[in-house]
Amino acid sequence: MDVFYRPELGLIVEHLGTDNELVDCMDGRLLNPGHAIEAMWFIMDLGKRLGDQALIEKAVKIALAEAEYGWDKQYGGIFYFMDRLGRPLQQLEWDQKLWWVHIETLITMIKGYELTGNAECLAWFERIHDYVWSHFMDPEHPEWFGYLNRQGEVLLTLKGGKWKGCFHVPRGLMQVYQSLERIAEKHD
C-alpha cells in the first residue's frame, strides 16, 4: 500500500526498480488490474480486523481506480494485463478476459460496498456481475469458462486445467454470498 501503490498514477504497479522507483521498460510498466483488485479485498479484510476504516477506504479508492483503468471501454470486461503508458505489451494474452479477474472483482466490489456503503462499489459489482453471467457462464453445462477473447467470446471450452482449478469461482461465490447476507442483515 505504500510501495507498489503509486499515488501519482492512482494504481498499483507490478515491478519497481531497486530504489522503489518506476522503471520505463516492459516489466516496469506492466499492470495487472486483477492482482491489484484482488489484493484490495485482502486489505479490506485486514482493515476490518484492525478496526482501521481509513485503510478500508484507501483500499476501496484503489480498487475503484483499478477497475476503471482496467475496464475495456469498447467490449466490456477487465483486461488481463496493461501497460501504464499505453505501450505494447510482451504478454500475448494481454487483452483476454479471465475468470479469476472477474470473480475477484465481484468480491472486492461487494466487500467495498458492505464496509463503506460506497455506491460506486455497488455499481461496479452490478456491472461485473452482468458481464460475468452473460459471458463466462456456460448455460448448457454450468460452470464458468476460464478464458475469453477481447470481444468476450469463449477462447477455450475447457473449464479446468493447470491454472483454472476449483478455487477462485467457489471461493469467490462464497465470499460474495457472505457479504450479501451481511448487507441484507443490516437492512432488516
In which residue ranges do the predicted regions lie?
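Glycan-recognition and catalytic cores of secretory/periplasmic carbohydrate-active enzymes
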Residues: 1-188
